[in-house]
Amino acid sequence: LGVLATANQSLMLNLRREMSIWNINSFGEFFLQILGKYEKAYAQAMDAFREERSRFVKALENISYLRVIPSEANYVLCEVKEHFTARELAVRLLREYGILIKDCSQKCKGNYIRLAVRDTNDNNQLLKALREL
């Protein structure tokens, strides 16, 4: 399962000529066969994830030195506004709490961290650590 996008018409013609009609591997075929079986469980898991993500983001918004950047991803990007640099915060969380977060200051050209949205217990541990700092 995948996508190829190109403006090169010659390349597209050559690929179409060589590609079988059913361009899918055995894993993809198996996945499509069982997809319906797990549709309800997947929908329930996604609902639970969205609910936990919303709760986590609201709690992060109450931490004075963070500014949450709105998104719909499975992580939360935050600007570290005061007290620490992104790197300092990442190092302290790792050293003092054993929690690993992503320091995005090099890639984002600013003082940013990326926090994974995990389960309620893990998210609560991170929130507790952020509040204590």
What are these regions (language model features)?
Residues 7-8, 37, 81, 118-120:
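Residue-level recognition of strand-loop junctions within catalytic nucleotide-signaling folds
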Residues 49-54, 60-96, 113, 117:
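Conserved PLP-binding catalytic core of the aspartate aminotransferase-like
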Residues 23-25, 74, 123:
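Asparagine-centered polar/low-complexity signal
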Residues 15, 89, 126-129:
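Hydrophobic side chains in well-ordered alpha-helices
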Residues 1-62, 67-69:
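PLP-dependent aminotransferase class I/II
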